[in-house]
Structure formats: structure tokens, C-alpha cells
Amino acid sequence: MIKVLFFAQVRELVGTDATEVAADFPTVEALRQHMAAQSDRWALALEDGKLLAAVNQTLVSFDHPLTDGDEVAFFPPVTGG
């Protein structure tokens, strides 16, 4: 299983802070695409190009490989003022 965490606006849009999915996705991008297909709100929350990802608490690119037991976090880019 892969544990998926959502933070900030992503969490608000998907309506949960975490979920678990089968370890059937070779990359972070494959997982993102699968989850974005669940509904319009999920698609908006996980929109390509407006999201960062971390695997096991390390910032990664979306072509990063996934394995069983990984923890993936999706969150919006941090902005400051």
C-alpha cells in the first residue's frame, strides 16, 4: 500500500487529509493521474503544474518511482509575501 497525504488547499479540495491506495503505480505522476480522475474536485486539487510532491518526506519530481510502503504527499507550492 501507498499512503497519500494532502496538505493546505489540496486537502481542502479533496476533503480528506490522507488515504491509502494499492502500490500499483510506477511513478508519482501515474498516482497523480489516477487520483485526479476520481472527480472534478480531485482533478482541480491535483492539477498538473500546480502541485509539489514528496516521497518519504523528500521533495521529488513527478517521474520519481514508487514502491510498496511509500508515503506520498501532495501540496501546493509555497509562496511568500
Swiss-Prot record:
Q: Which Gene Ontology BP terms does the record give?
A: Mo-molybdopterin cofactor biosynthetic process
**Does this entry carry the keyword Phosphoprotein?**
yes
Q: Which residues, renumbered to this chain, carry the PTM Glycyl adenylate?
A: 81
**Where 1-thioglycine occurs along the chain?**
81
Induction section of the entry: By anaerobiosis, repressed by the molybdenum cofactor.
Sorted alphabetically, which Gene3D superfamilies does this protein's record hold?
3.10.20.30
Which UniProt keywords are listed? Answer: Isopeptide bond, Molybdenum cofactor biosynthesis, Nucleotide-binding, Phosphoprotein
What is its quaternary makeup?
Heterotetramer of 2 MoaD subunits and 2 MoaE subunits. Forms a stable heterotetrameric complex of 2 MoaD and 2 MoeB during adenylation of MoaD by MoeB. During catalysis MoaD shuttles between the two heterotetrameric complexes.
Question: What is the official name of this protein in its record?
Answer: Molybdopterin synthase sulfur carrier subunit
Gene symbol of the encoding locus? moaD
